[in-house]
Amino acid sequence: MDKLFIQADELLQDSFKLAWQVYESGYRPNYIVGVWRGGAPIGIAVQEFLDVLGVSSDHIAIRTSHYSSMGKAGNQVQVYGLNYIIKQVESEDSLLIVDDVHDTGISIQKIISDLQKACKKNTPEIKVATPYFKPQKNKTKRKPDFYLHETEKWLVFPHELEGLSFDEISKFKPELSDLIEKIKPLIS
């Protein structure tokens, strides 16, 4: 499996570049929704950058989870935390959903679908921003409105450790080497 290890400073720079792409397009979101976990820090950076440029927005993190229903393997998505947005938005508003990667697109599709169902005539204009897009994995007709990189590699974000070998952590996350040596006996 070909992995792409993304460094924290690289992700932050990409987050600001993503915000600039949104700004340059003329889109002015007055709501920004970061998808927990990976989209939250990117959403914060996008919101901060746009705010500096005079685009103020209300912002919140939401969460999704995948679950299985009878006979289906993990195809169902549950969205948590949309109530605040649903109660606040109006049809003339602009909402930007920020995530770390647009993979299958199923989670983003479910978020948008849930917003449209709940908001009905008050559904705002919705756009999606992600630093990474995996077009071959996309199972929806939607692609992100704003993205920086197309890839099919397995992405390893700065906060991710699960599923990595000690060798991978040492090589690609050298700043953790002292901590890894301390915890290695506890998890080996």
Residue spans for each PLM region:
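PRPP-associated nucleotide enzymes
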Residues: M1-S188
